[in-house]
């Protein structure tokens, strides 16, 4: 595997921050809404963001 440049690491770090925040927000919203279907959709969205977060983390060996 090739080494990542500092710019690439910075971009991945920014993406990790964004994905983590989106995951947390979607999970929080899924617990506060009263509509069951909307809650389920928000949970799925949170899961997708968590998967992307983990994939990005894997890029930097975390």
Spans of model-derived segments:
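His/Met- and acidic-residue-enriched segments that coordinate or traffic transition-metal cofactors
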Residues: 1-62
